[in-house]
A protein has these predicted regions:
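Sec/Tat signal peptide C-region and signal peptidase I cleavage site
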Residues: 15-20
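Short, glycine-anchored, charge-dense loop/turn motifs used at functional sites
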Residues: 333, 468-471
């Protein structure tokens, strides 16, 4: 009883100053909602129409159930997957972790939707939603990014850290909130996707909050006690291929030929080709190499510090051990679906020929590069929290480069980022990763402090100037004569 009270009190104390903490700024790392008549807007419209057709089906019934707006309403939906009840009085430590994430998530969503003014689909088309009794209540709210997919995915990522033994089922449940928001008419598909990415950004920011790791540890202990499950929070270093989240289970199938998303993929492929001779096209080729050193180069430019094995050994080791997991976690779906890559499907050249032969017979969906870059941006965001928005923006650009070069369809890239989010979450169930992250954070803090100390030191040109009598001048001398600047005599004529 006392521990429960302490956890509740600690959670609220941690959140008392939460408004003063920065929330992820979606305007920095996400594109704006699609403009009318754009390819993505047309895709959104088709999917809205298709969603309406599903409202009388079993999937429509599920969508209606999924349209919830509070943590207490989300929890029964996850309880069906977890096999335990989560509330303030049952599995209370898990509930407090989610409650803390929910309060911060609500702030982040509020800040995000205030940046946009996109009408909800049912408002735009002047039609009733699947839940007409809620239409008036939510009609003035922006639909971008989608509330349900953001919080639903955030809860799924948090629970994947708590319950790694059932992570695939949890992630599958979390992903389903996006399509439900589309079917209900409350969100467009692009709103739902933006919500997923915001949810992953929120998780990364939560891991920088003081006391959050304690809440997570208590929640993990709660789950193990209640279920007797053998969790992954042990001393085995990181993950084997078999232990990674299974992308076949929690991702939707790649778009079928002739579908709205496939048509959108074709349009984005043509758009990508038109960008190959631009700066974006050049950068896409620079980003092709999937390696520790290339990721360090890319994110060093964002952070403004050099990241390599000599200057930052702890961060370098973190990158070298994490980045392979981003690509590895996509291989299950790649092998299962064996979707043809764009240059193979279209029988055309890419903008980077050396990799064509080696990748021709490999699956395109989802993108390993997009997964790895988003994963590394989330990891770097935990190391350097003040740079999160810029890091995620760079990762988003990295993923788009795969469309420009012709190695991936847009939907490959989109869902690759979700894979990276899932891997980032479950990494926090590994003690060695958590320890390595702590070393990397401390190393970055020391390096950042040293850099700023050097920058703040007066340079020789800024040395104080004195008269020969020892009087320090508050401004450069205007009279002729001999003065002392630093350790040198200067003659003002």
């Amino acid at each position: 009883m006392y521990r429960r009270f302490f956890l509740i009190l600690m959670s609220y104390i941690l959140c008392t100053d939460i408004c003063a903490q920065d929330v992820p700024q979606v305007t920095v790392f996400l594109p704006n909602p699609p403009k009318a008549e754009s390819d993505l807007f047309i895709c959104d419209n088709y999917l809205y129409t298709y969603g309406k057709e599903l409202r009388t089906s079993d999937r429509g019934t599920q969508a209606k159930i999924d349209m919830v707006w509070s943590l207490d309403d989300y929890m029964p939906l996850y309880a069906d997957v977890m096999g335990i009840t989560v509330s303030a009085f049952k599995a209370s430590n898990i509930y407090q972790l989610l409650s803390y994430g929910d309060r911060y998530g609500q702030l982040a969503i509020k800040a995000a939707v205030m940046s946009y003014n996109r009408e909800r689909p049912y408002v735009y088309f002047n039609e009733p939603s699947l839940l007409p009794e809620l239409d008036e209540l939510h009609s003035d709210e922006s639909s971008y990014p989608a509330y349900q997919s953001c919080l639903g995915w955030l809860y799924a990522l948090l629970l994947a850290e708590v319950c790694p033994d059932i992570m695939n089922d949890i992630l599958k449940r979390g992903e389903a909130f996006g399509p439900s928001a589309v079917i209900s008419g409350f969100s467009f598909d692009s709103d739902a996707y933006a919500g997923y990415l915001l949810g992953s950004a929120i998780l990364s920011r939560l891991h920088t909050h003081s006391g959050f790791d304690d809440l997570l540890a208590y929640a993990q202990a709660d789950y193990k006690r209640l279920t007797k499950a053998s969790t992954r929070f042990d001393d085995t270093p990181y993950f084997s291929y078999e232990e990674l989240p299974n992308s076949v289970i929690y991702l939707p199938e790649p778009p079928a030929a002739g579908s709205a998303k496939y048509t959108y993929d074709l349009a984005k492929y043509e758009e990508g080709k038109s960008l190959r001779r631009t700066r974006s096209g050049i950068r896409a080729i620079e980003d092709v190499e999937y390696s520790t050193d290339n990721f360090c180069r890319i994110y060093s430019e964002v952070l403004g510090v050099t990241i390599n094995a000599t200057v930052t050994p702890a961060i370098y080791e973190l990158v070298s051990r994490v980045h392979p997991l981003g690509n590895a976690a996509t291989q299950m779906a790649k092998g299962h679906y064996m979707r043809k890559r764009p240059y193979v499907e279209m029988n055309e050249e890419t903008s980077y020929r050396p990799d064509e032969a080696g990748l021709r017979e490999t699956g395109s969906y989802p993108s390993g590069h997009a997964s790895g870059s988003w994963l590394m941006a989330l990891v770097f965001s935990e190391v350097a929290r003040t740079q999160q928005d810029a890091l995620l923006a760079r990762a988003y650009t990295f993923g788009q480069g795969r469309v420009i070069t012709g190695y991936h369809w847009q939907t490959d890239v989109d869902y690759g980022r979700l894979v990276g989010s899932a891997v980032y979450a479950v990494l926090h169930t590994d003690k060695e990763f958590v320890s390595q992250m702590a070393r990397a954070v401390n190393e970055y803090k020391s390096l950042y402090s040293a850099i700023h100390t050097v920058k703040d030191e007066p340079q020789e040109t800024e040395a104080p100037i004195y008269t020969l009598q020892g009087v320090r001048l508050s401004a450069p001398p205007t009279r002729h004569g001999i003065y002392i600047k630093g350790k040198k005599k200067i003659n003002i004529r």
